[in-house]
Swiss-Prot record:
Residues 1-32 form the signal peptide. This is Metabotropic glutamate receptor 4. It comes from Homo sapiens (Human). G-protein coupled receptor for glutamate. Ligand binding causes a conformation change that triggers signaling via guanine nucleotide-binding proteins (G proteins) and modulates the activity of down-stream effectors. Signaling inhibits adenylate cyclase activity. Keywords: Cell membrane, Disulfide bond, G-protein coupled receptor, Glycoprotein, Membrane, Receptor, Signal, Transducer, Transmembrane, Transmembrane helix. Belongs to the G-protein coupled receptor 3 family. Interacts with PICK1. Disulfide bonds join 67-109, 249-538, 372-388, 428-435, 520-539, 524-542, 545-557, 560-573. InterPro entries: ANF_lig-bd_rcpt, GPCR_3, GPCR_3_9-Cys_dom, GPCR_3_9-Cys_sf, GPCR_3_C, GPCR_3_CS, GPCR_3_mGluR4, GPCR_3_mtglu_rcpt. L-glutamate binds at residues 159, 180-182, 230, 312, 405.
Amino acid sequence: MPGKRGLGWWWARLPLCLLLSLYGPWMPSSLGKPKGHPHMNSIRIDGDITLGGLFPVHGRGSEGKPCGELKKEKGIHRLEAMLFALDRINNDPDLLPNITLGARILDTCSRDTHALEQSLTFVQALIEKDGTEVRCGSGGPPIITKPERVVGVIGASGSSVSIMVANILRLFKIPQISYASTAPDLSDNSRYDFFSRVVPSDTYQAQAMVDIVRALKWNYVSTVASEGSYGESGVEAFIQKSREDGGVCIAQSVKIPREPKAGEFDKIIRRLLETSNARAVIIFANEDDIRRVLEAARRANQTGHFFWMGSDSWGSKIAPVLHLEEVAEGAVTILPKRMSVRGFDRYFSSRTLDNNRRNIWFAEFWEDNFHCKLSRHALKKGSHVKKCTNRERIGQDSAYEQEGKVQFVIDAVYAMGHALHAMHRDLCPGRVGLCPRMDPVDGTQLLKYIRNVNFSGIAGNPVTFNENGDAPGRYDIYQYQLRNDSAEYKVIGSWTDHLHLRIERMHWPGSGQQLPRSICSLPCQPGERKKTVKGMPCCWHCEPCTGYQYQVDRYTCKTCPYDMRPTENRTGCRPIPIIKLEWGSPWAVLPLFLAVVGIAATLFVVITFVRYNDTPIVKASGRELSYVLLAGIFLCYATTFLMIAEPDLGTCSLRRIFLGLGMSISYAALLTKTNRIYRIFEQGKRSVSAPRFISPASQLAITFSLISLQLLGICVWFVVDPSHSVVDFQDQRTLDPRFARGVLKCDISDLSLICLLGYSMLLMVTCTVYAIKTRGVPETFNEAKPIGFTMYTTCIVWLAFIPIFFGTSQSADKLYIQTTTLTVSVSLSASVSLGMLYMPKVYIILFHPEQNVPKRKRSLKAVVTAATMSNKFTQKGNFRPNGEAKSELCENLEAPALATKQTYVTYTNHAI
């Protein structure tokens, strides 16, 4: 009794009492209808125990109206499901025998504030107004119908409505079982401790949707949520699960206002299009908002652009997609696993205006369902609306499909019935009807029995609750498909703790069975690394591995080892090809040709000289140094073969030895010759005595001394840096690794080559200087001028060699150009010496043997006279062949010399 309540109990309910006092004047009158008759805003069915019911019979009103248009499926179907379940329980002798369940069913109008006002009816009996002192004008007591005591509530539908109602019901310890509210917030047992539901929490639904997104290989999606607990909590759960599982990023997260302004949905579509790659849109919204989003997408000409994924509020409903089939095509929706209740189909199809008077909204449903009017006064002139005949039948004269939550409404009512049955069995054992311990029913005790129920639902599914009052997660997955101008929701999979998705049964607009893309960035190609966008792990830029880098993993490029280059797709490394100058290379043709011809010519000259070794012209050329010079020329030509041969230890050692040795031998011999001529000529200017070291033995000694310096340098080089072959990967390490080559070569650097040839060049320059100094020697004094011409030409060859050789050091064909240039230059130098010094002699020997005769002896005195008096007889000598003026001079001077018997050295046959 109120008088026995504690002070704390009343203090906690003081705000509610004040609220009820405002409604007090109207509520008794509204509840004072005769038994069994409906109210204008609720259904009342009498029984021993009364259950409350909350259903969205109407949608949200506009322009200040609390209620809008009738909801045939979400409202009437579900409401009738509760009435159907009550009838079954009341007629079941094994469930609550001799106890009748009554009901008080209210319309929430899909609005939480309106539902709050309506739900005050459920607690009115708990806060009774003492009317003993109230008297009517006649002095009698007022006629007030005592409100029924509601022991439990079935509903509500929307999560925001359930949350609002749960906050009141928990104060009065009235258990509540929802058939459709799935917001994760309602799992908070500390705030909504008297709330339970036969549908799974959106936490499970969010996990299922994340699994679907991943299975479809989408990683960049947008979310749309209706303002309120259901939409916002659902999207929040989806985002949380996507972060936990990874691999899914949110492009846009849009919230639909509770009272959207004009153009709000067009703005939402424009915002979704800002991230056009995110074609998948996750929708946690009520069906009205879903429909308006689809309409806005059609207005924006985005039919087929978005791929919708709807939560259970969309499910398999027709209303959200009616006349929007093309926009909604391909939509993937999720719905708690359910089965059609055939008994309900028979029940609902049999409802008529005559046998269903307890449903105060059934007449309105009848008019809306059959497009007719019950009253003639409601018919407008000129209207095509007909008058209802009451002979219309559901399913025959109108389309009918069982609403998706009917099963759960029935299961919720049965859960309450089973809990009351177990409670009656324990508290009233053996008693028929209610016992004092259940009159009134204690809500806290009833809640414990509700949480412990375990039975098979109307469709054979198990009905249980966990400690938070949630049902286990079991979902069916649908896709809205258009086939042959007909649209249907087709089951494509299920989810019970993990996903079972039949992708082959899916069909997408424009692409058939090919999975559409909803990704932030396209996958990187092989050889590219991902550079993720900060804060968006699903978005990245693809950066190619450059240069000699290869792809180690998705995020890393690494440089290949120095002797390797990346593969074509840059996913690994492969050895760099090793090149060398091949015998058949075009670069080797000219050097080999010159070398072969030169060696042949050299051997021919040697053979000729050996054959005619004792002839005057061979003797006059200085046989000893001539053969040394020919040996040097031969080595110059032979060096070409060493330069083209494959580099190895032996080849590289021979290159070091013979590359400069052939030239050193040649120029040492020529230098010795020019130096001998110069010394004889200069000595003749000063005295008639012979210069020292002009004998053949001395000349050979000088030549070999000069050559030994070259050999000594080579020996020191071998000791300091032993010869070996190397593969140079830097020489042709091009910017494009496809053209990179390793060059197999000897360890002779450019600096080493300069040092190797430097001594030969020094001999060549010195020889050239002597050739210039002896340019005035008479032609009869052997080879002074031919040697001069040889050295001038050789200098020109090597001056051309230097810029070509060192100017191509950065060329990709450096190996070929430098080797060819070096070998050709050496061969040309040898050819110049061979051609200018020996070919004229060979020509005379072979073709003009008559000229190969001894000349008259010339004395040193003649040489001296020629050196001192040559200018005097220059003009005369120019008119006489072979220096006859000088001969005459010598002959004129010979007689006095004999008379005085002066001693002098005589040279025979011009062997100077």
